[in-house]
């Protein structure tokens, strides 16, 4: 199976959900074995940042990566699109310190990546395969990884809220099945908004880029895109957080009520317990996974 990149550069512009600033991000094709690379230009200096579990420096309400020179927050939705579409190599050039929130989902990122086109490269695809069971538990939060020939999620959330309640999603993630969660938006509670604003967070948050719930209902006029949009979005976040590994993961992941912090701690545990093996997919025949995806995704968008 061959590695992939995008066929042409694309630019996104939008508001940072926490900073409230207008931001630009440009994605560029990258050569084989580049992986996912962030670039931030400050003045005359170009800083490079490669995602990794140790590059995560904050997980409050979003995943933030950084080093001594730069920080980039809210990276998870864009990374979910890249990993969900199985794009191996890409350069992400960021103007600012945050990825724009767009509509609160991965819908726009996914759509534009598909419109740009996916290009196969000569090099063989490499993955990190789970080779033994690993379990991370912190309070009620739980993530368990098992060996599996693919990338499969079994995600459960449980809220004491009449609209959310108990939701479960089982998904064998491929570029096609990823479309079923790409449009699921981030969510929050009206009771928490005032405190977030006092703490300098959610400065760009609105009903245009998040589902907001009061004690009994969704207050967005258009309602939900799916009855289980909440667990779909949590699965989206998980995929984005797993992209902190330098290569795609392969395994079966059972997740209960996790969040960005726990996802990152889980990745550290996978590394600490030597539960991952580097696998080159030499024997896999490359098929055009993207041939029918764009028309299919357009059909999905038409239903929203």
UniProtKB/Swiss-Prot annotation:
It holds the Pfam family LpxC. GO terms for biological process: lipid A biosynthetic process. It comes from the Bacteria. Keywords: Hydrolase, Lipid A biosynthesis, Lipid biosynthesis, Lipid metabolism, Metal-binding, Zinc. Its cofactor is Zn(2+). One of its GO terms (cellular component) is membrane. Its EC number is 3.5.1.108. The keyword Lipid metabolism applies. The active site is at 260 (proton donor). Zn(2+) binds at residues 77, 233, 237. InterPro entries: Ribosomal_Su5_D2-typ_SF (IPR020568), UDP-acyl_GlcNac_deAcase (IPR004463), UDP-acyl_GlcNac_deAcase_C (IPR011334), UDP-acyl_N-AcGlcN_deAcase_N (IPR015870). It catalyses: a UDP-3-O-[(3R)-3-hydroxyacyl]-N-acetyl-alpha-D-glucosamine + H2O = a UDP-3-O-[(3R)-3-hydroxyacyl]-alpha-D-glucosamine + acetate. The keyword Lipid biosynthesis applies. One of its GO terms (molecular function) is UDP-3-O-acyl-N-acetylglucosamine deacetylase activity. SUPFAM superfamilies: Ribosomal protein S5 domain 2-like. Pathway: Glycolipid biosynthesis; lipid IV(A) biosynthesis; lipid IV(A) from (3R)-3-hydroxytetradecanoyl-[acyl-carrier-protein] and UDP-N-acetyl-alpha-D-glucosamine: step 2/6. It is an enzyme of class 3 (hydrolase). Catalyzes the hydrolysis of UDP-3-O-myristoyl-N-acetylglucosamine to form UDP-3-O-myristoylglucosamine and acetate, the committed step in lipid A biosynthesis. Belongs to the LpxC family. This is UDP-3-O-acyl-N-acetylglucosamine deacetylase. It comes from Lawsonia intracellularis (strain PHE/MN1-00).
């Amino acid at each position: 199976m061959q590695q992939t990149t995008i066929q042409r550069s694309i630019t996104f512009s939008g508001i940072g959900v926490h900073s409230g600033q207008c931001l630009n991000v440009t994605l560029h094709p990258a050569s084989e074995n580049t992986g996912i690379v962030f670039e931030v230009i400050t003045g005359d200096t170009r800083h490079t940042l490669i995602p990794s579990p140790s590059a995560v420096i904050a997980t409050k309400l979003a995943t933030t990566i950084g080093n001594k020179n730069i920080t980039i927050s809210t990276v998870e939705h864009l990374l979910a699109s890249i990993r969900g579409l199985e794009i191996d190599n890409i350069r992400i050039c960021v103007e600012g310190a945050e990825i724009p929130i767009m509509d609160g989902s991965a819908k726009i990122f996914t759509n534009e990546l598909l419109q740009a086109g996916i290009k196969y490269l000569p090099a063989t695809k490499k993955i990190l395969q789970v080779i033994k069971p690993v379990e991370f538990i912190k309070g009620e939060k739980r993530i368990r990884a098992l060996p599996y020939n693919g990338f499969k999620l079994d995600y459960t959330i449980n809220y004491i809220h009449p609209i959310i309640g108990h939701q479960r999603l089982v998904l064998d993630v491929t570029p096609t099945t990823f479309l079923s969660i790409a449009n699921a938006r981030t969510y929050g509670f009206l009771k928490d908004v005032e405190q977030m604003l006092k703490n300098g967070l959610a400065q760009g948050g609105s009903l245009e880029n998040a589902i907001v719930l009061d004690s009994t209902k969704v207050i967005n006029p258009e309602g939900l895109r799916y009855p289980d949009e909440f667990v779909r979005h949590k699965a989206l976040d998980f995929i984005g957080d797993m992209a902190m590994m330098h290569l795609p993961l392969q395994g079966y992941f059972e997740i209960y009520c996790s969040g960005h912090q726990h996802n990152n701690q889980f990745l550290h545990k996978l590394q600490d317990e030597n539960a991952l093996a580097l696998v080159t997919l030499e024997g896999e025949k490359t098929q055009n996974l993207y041939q029918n995806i764009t028309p299919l995704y357009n059909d999905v968008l038409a239903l929203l």
